[in-house]
């Protein structure tokens, strides 16, 4: 709330401004709507009835006032930076991730390929729902490596400097998910799904945990927010859960162990 007071007159400008470079790429700096989006995320996680009502209100405010639109084509903007409320830029991201996101023939075996069958299940392609989903489509969400499998394109190198080495932390799409869960209004889920390429033929009539699980899984594929959705809902299992943990996920699995440095130096 204090941030909201200080940022009340924040002049958000998402585009380039040659006369005032500071205003350009506002999504790379904490701004009014990034602060509000973070507040909505925290309130949703806290989960009380008043928290949910406020989370829904704030999410709808961000959707209506931030000036950004949901990405409908991620061929160039694979990480959906054009709808990002707050992001980081990592100069050496491509070098750091090269061994994991590497489509070259020289791959040493550490690259993160997924099988077509696993991808089809994750994005609901087997039921035809996600066949045109840009988060899945080859050349859009996924790279088709032939016999090697498929790979998420979010972290692959690009020559487009606008989208190069960007690491989104909060995107507009998450506000639609928060609004849907907090208010129970399926229209927000359908708006997100339609923008990503899912036909209105498959529109949902209600917001269920199963529907939210599917959309979080697809929207944050190869990202971290899906983990926190699973933790927040105390999910006992998830898509492609290891057989040894199927139906047995508990708070123990949802708490990261302390690092060795923290144990040693407190």
Label the model's feature ranges:
Residues 1-102, 113, 126-266:
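Acidic/polar-rich alpha-helix caps and helix-coil junctions
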Residues 106-123, 130:
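Short, cationic low-complexity segments
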């Amino acid at each position: 709330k204090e941030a909201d007071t200080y940022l009340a007159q924040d002049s958000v400008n998402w585009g380039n401004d040659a006369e005032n470079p500071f205003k350009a790429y506002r999504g790379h700096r904490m701004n009014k709507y990034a602060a509000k989006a973070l507040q909505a995320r925290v309130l949703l996680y806290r989960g009380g009835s008043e928290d949910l009502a406020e989370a829904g209100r704030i999410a709808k405010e961000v959707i209506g006032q931030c000036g950004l639109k949901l990405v409908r084509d991620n061929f160039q903007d694979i990480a959906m930076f054009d709808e990002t409320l707050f992001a980081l830029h990592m100069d050496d991201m491509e070098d750091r991730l090269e061994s994991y996101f590497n489509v070259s023939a020289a791959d040493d075996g550490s690259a993160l390929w997924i099988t077509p069958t696993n991808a089809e299940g994750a994005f609901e392609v087997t039921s035809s729902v996600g066949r045109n989903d840009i988060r899945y489509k080859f050349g859009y969400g996924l790279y088709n490596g032939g016999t090697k499998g498929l790979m998420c394109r979010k972290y692959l190198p690009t020559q487009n400097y606008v989208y190069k080495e960007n690491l989104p932390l909060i995107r507009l799409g998450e506000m639609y998910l928060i609004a849907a869960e907090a208010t129970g209004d399926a229209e927000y889920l359908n708006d997100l799904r339609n923008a990503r390429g899912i036909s209105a033929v498959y529109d949902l009539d209600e917001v269920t945990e199963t529907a939210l699980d599917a959309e979080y899984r697809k929207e944050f594929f190869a990202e971290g927010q899906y983990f926190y959705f699973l933790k927040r809902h105390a999910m006992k299992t998830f898509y492609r859960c290891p057989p040894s943990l199927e139906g047995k996920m508990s708070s123990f699995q949802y708490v990261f162990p302390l690092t060795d440095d923290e144990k040693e130096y407190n």
